[in-house]
Every structure is written in structure tokens, then in C-alpha cells.
Amino acid sequence: TLAKLTTRDEERILAEDINLKIRGSEKICIIGANGVGKTTLLRKIAEELSQRDDIKAEYMPQNYEEILDLDMTPVDFLDKSGDKEERTRIRTYLGSLKYTADEMEHPIRELSGGQKAKVFLLSMSLSGANVLILDEPTRNFSPLSGPVIRKMLREFPGAIISISHDRKYIDEVADLVYVLSEDGLKLLQ
């Protein structure tokens, strides 16, 4: 619950009376006009959930590339243990996301925007998170990658709170769609 959503400098109220409840592994998508405060709301949700001990939330901002180590290969970036079995498992996941063996060994900086996003999303899902908070998760995907990512997110066992303008993502991944406006956050029936 948020009484009012303001800009970062708190100069302007973007929306008031925001209530959002998530049950279990619900997949929620927030839509609304550009500039209404969707990203600001998502940041606040991420901040709030990161404070809780009963939830492990991971946040994917629109500018996620700043968080990736672009000099590492996808396998090295995703491998936290150095264990041979873990590296094999990571390669299998990457293969299921349409990576070639060659792409798995290239520095992340040489990959397409969609391939970088897949690395980031996979790192989130391998982290043990039970809530993913995603700001425009499909914006960099090619028509070939989109279905694979939507399926991966649909099958994620935890909850997802996201913002998207992608109609296919909304239709295939979201259980509930909310509209953010100056009047607050309303469930789309």
C-alpha cells in the first residue's frame, strides 16, 4: 500500500491510493500511459521487497546492462560455484534459450541486446529468488527469442511483478493486469 507515488525529487505526485496484493506465484503486469510512474512504482516495490526477510526478490531495471559484467562470458557470469556440474547445467539452460556453444564463450559485450537480457533473466532465476520484478523484460528480444523468454517466465515457480507494453507478454505471462493512472492502481477486469 502506498498513499502517494511521487517523482524521485518528490516535486510531483504521479498517483495516489496504490494497493497491490500478490498471492503465491501470481504473475502481475502493470500497464499505463508513458510518464505515469510505472518505473517509479516498480523501483519502490523492489526497494520495499528487498527489506523483507521472508521474500527473495530480484529486480531487472530497463538499464540492466549496467549491472552485467560485460567482459565475462555468459557461463562465467552465471557460474557462482566453479563446480563442473554447475557449469554443465548453465550450458544446458543457455542452450534451451537458443545460445550456441560459441555464444556461451564470447564476452557478454559482444552479444545482442536480447542475448544480454537472457543472461540477466537467467541469473535472476538461478539466484533462488521467489519474486522477479521486471521493467519491460521483453523489450530487447527478437521475434525468435520472445516465445522462449515468455515460456521461461510463465514457468518461473515464483511471483512476477512487471511492466510491459508487449501484448504477447501480457497475454501469455500475466495472470493479472493492473492499470496505473493518476487515480491509482486498478485491476483490469
Question: Would you name each region that the model predicts?
Answer:
Residues 1-189:
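ABC ATP-binding cassette signature C-motif
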